[in-house]
Amino acid sequence: FLNIKKNLGDQNLTNPINLLPEIGAENGRTGIRKKEDFLKLVNIIGEDSSKNFTFAGISSYEGIAAVAMKGSNAVHDFCSKIEDIINDIPSNYYSHLNELLITAGGSTHFDIVGERFSKIKLSVPIKVLLRSGCYITHDHGPYLDALETAKSDSNRQWDQSLQPALEIWSYVQSIPENNLAFLTMGKRDAPYDSGLPKPI
C-alpha cells in the first residue's frame, strides 16, 4: 500500500483504488498474520487523506491453511480468525460502501468458506467471492481425491461431484514401448496445477 501511495505522489485519482488486504495463515504464503497488524493497515487505508484508496474488503486463501495446518478443522480455525478480525474492523471504514467484499481462494474447501462467510452480519451487506485455486479448470486426480475426502466428512454434507469442464484431444504420435505413448501435446497445451493430466 505504501509503495502504491508513494508512486502516485500528489495525483488525485478520479476513481479510487479498491483495496482488499489479505489475511494469511500461519506457515502459509502471503497475507498479514497478526490481527493487530491487519487492523493497523485498515486504519492507515481508512485515514488516508488522499482519497485515492478505498478499503473494499478482505482477501484470504484458505487452501494453504488446509495444507500448512492439516485438514478441514484447520480451515474452520482459519475462518474463525478471519471472522474475528472482520468483526473488529471499525464500521466507519466500510459503512459508506454498498457492500463489503470477502474473498477466499482455494478449490477443496470452498463449501466451508461459503457457508461460514455467508453468515457474517455487519452494518452493510456482505458479498462472498470464492476464487478457484486453479486456472480455468480442475485437475482430475488431486481434486477427485479432495472430493472423496469431503464426502467422507459428515459435517460437510457433500452429495455432488465435480464435473469435467475442459477436454483436450490429441493424436498419439508414437508408442515405442509397451505402456509408453507420446502425444502431440504437452504442458504448454495442458498446463496443470497439481498432478499430471489424466487420459480418459
Report the location of each language-model feature.
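Active-site loop/helix belt of alpha/beta enzymes
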Residues: 7-18, 24-156
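Charged (often Lys/Glu-rich) extended helix/loop segments that serve as interaction or gating elements
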Residues: 136-200
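Catalytic beta/alpha-barrel core
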Residues: 1, 22
